[in-house]
Amino acid sequence: MSILGLNGAPVGAEQLGSALDRMKKAHLEQGPANLELRLSRLDRAIAMLLENREAIADAVSADFGNRSREQTLLCDIAGSVASLKDSREHVAKWMEPEHHKAMFPGAEARVEFQPLGVVGVISPWNFPIVLAFGPLAGIFAAGNRAMLKPSELTPRTSALLAELIARYFDETELTTVLGDAEVGALFSAQPFDHLIFTGGTAVAKHIMRAAADNLVPVTLELGGKSPVIVSRSADMADVAQRVLTVKTFNAGQICLAPDYVLLPEESLDSFVAEATRFVAAMYPSLLDNPDYTSIINARNFDRLHRYLTDAQAKGGRVIEINPAAEELGDSGIRKIAPTLIVNVSDEMLVLNEEIFGPLLPIKTYRDFDSAIDYVNSKQRPLASYFFGEDAVEREQVLKRTVSGAVVVNDVMSHVMMDTLPFGGVGHSGMGAYHGIYGFRTFSHAKPVLVQSPVGESNLAMRAPYGEAIHGLLSVLLSTEC
């Protein structure tokens, strides 16, 4: 099979395996990366992004049809650089062994953090830079090499990444594989030392099956239907502003975007009014507004319109926030207005499938327990968002629901913090990265026990057994502390 792959050059399946072999060989022959080399890789990644940020923003926008330049610089470039700088600042401390108490006299116990080797990275299209270089911050800090497979849905960005990576890194440090889903399947079947995938749940199942053949450990960053749970104690204007800020950012094409809102039935009209007012102020027009991002491709554009048609057919009321009353459907630039959907029912597609767009279903409740029960009836989401000042209700969300993260009185801000792990649970993913959590994910925590020559750690195991072992066993098997 021929693929468009390694650093932009056509390669076959065997060449992909050979490239991985070269990276593994270099890792073994050159030994674990020391602090100086780790810092060098982090510095080169930072330089690559900063020195080429305008070209990257142009490529991303061309792939989307229109992608806000500021959103690319803020999230993809600045977000990546922040994670890389955090790793650069702390990696020396992270590398230090952890010393532990040894139970045997004369022994020393510690944990050393050893590089895994070569990590495979499969990154998505919605944030094609930060969801590649965010993981790489931990991968490089841990002393690994990496092979990156960016999304085929952003071909200009992926090709530019391949070109830049080849310029800033040796091919045995970081290399790029370009290609479609068939290439992605081949990539995920390689015997990496670890594989991280960011994307949808359905594809993640195939990734896990392929990785299992080589017993490759995986980190899966997925998505799901992240709920917004609004208390009666919440400020509805603040809720609407914070929720709609994220729901319209990148046109809602975010794994952590609010997927539906649960609010008290008497607050529905207030929320709709505040949301409409706020969105109109942010985006007085949509069609030619460079701040408002297009849907990535026709397939996803049609999918979102299918959700709207389905909701209307099943009794939903669709509230399109289109202040300039522009005709968007036939514009050719694939923009969909921010849209609220009320009178929703559980059989609607918008309440059963991850939306990944600027559509926001609103479901009302009478008592807070029913809101909790509704969240728990769904698969575990990547995040849950609670708004309100009622401490009892807040604790119910924290204790009675399970999600990758909980954010109180805000949306998505946790992902900006490298001091917190980023990851899902259940159908929203497994494993985590960011900061020290990424360093640990991409390291082998190797226990080391050093016994002194006079140590007695295994004397009790030596035959013949007599009074000494019986006395020891009586102590070890006692119920007393």
Swiss-Prot record:
Gene3D superfamilies noted in UniProt: Aldehyde Dehydrogenase, Chain A, domain 1, Aldehyde Dehydrogenase, Chain A, domain 2
Residues of the active site: 221, 255
GO terms under biological process: aldehyde metabolic process; eugenol catabolic process
GO cellular component: cytoplasm
Reactions performed catalytically: (E)-coniferaldehyde + NADP(+) + H2O = (E)-ferulate + NADPH + 2 H(+); (E)-coniferaldehyde + NAD(+) + H2O = (E)-ferulate + NADH + 2 H(+)
Pfam families cross-referenced by the UniProt entry: Aldedh
Alphabetically ordered keywords of this record: NAD, Oxidoreductase
Its EC number(s): 1.2.1.68
Lineage top rank: taxon: Bacteria
Transmembrane segments: none
Gene Ontology molecular functions: aldehyde dehydrogenase (NAD+) activity; coniferyl-aldehyde dehydrogenase [NAD(P)+] activity
InterPro entries, alphabetized: Ald_DH/histidinol_DH (IPR016161), Ald_DH_C (IPR016163), Ald_DH_CS_GLU (IPR029510), Ald_DH_N (IPR016162), Aldehyde_DH_dom (IPR015590), Aldehyde_DH_NAD(P) (IPR012394)
Family according to the record: Belongs to the aldehyde dehydrogenase family.
Function: Catalyzes the NAD(+)-dependent oxidation of coniferyl aldehyde to ferulic acid and which is induced during growth with eugenol as the carbon source.
Other notes: The enzyme activity with NADP(+) is 4.3% of that with NAD(+).
Subunit structure, as described in the record: Homodimer.
Protein name listed in UniProt: Coniferyl aldehyde dehydrogenase
The organism of origin for this protein: Pseudomonas sp. (strain HR199 / DSM 7063)
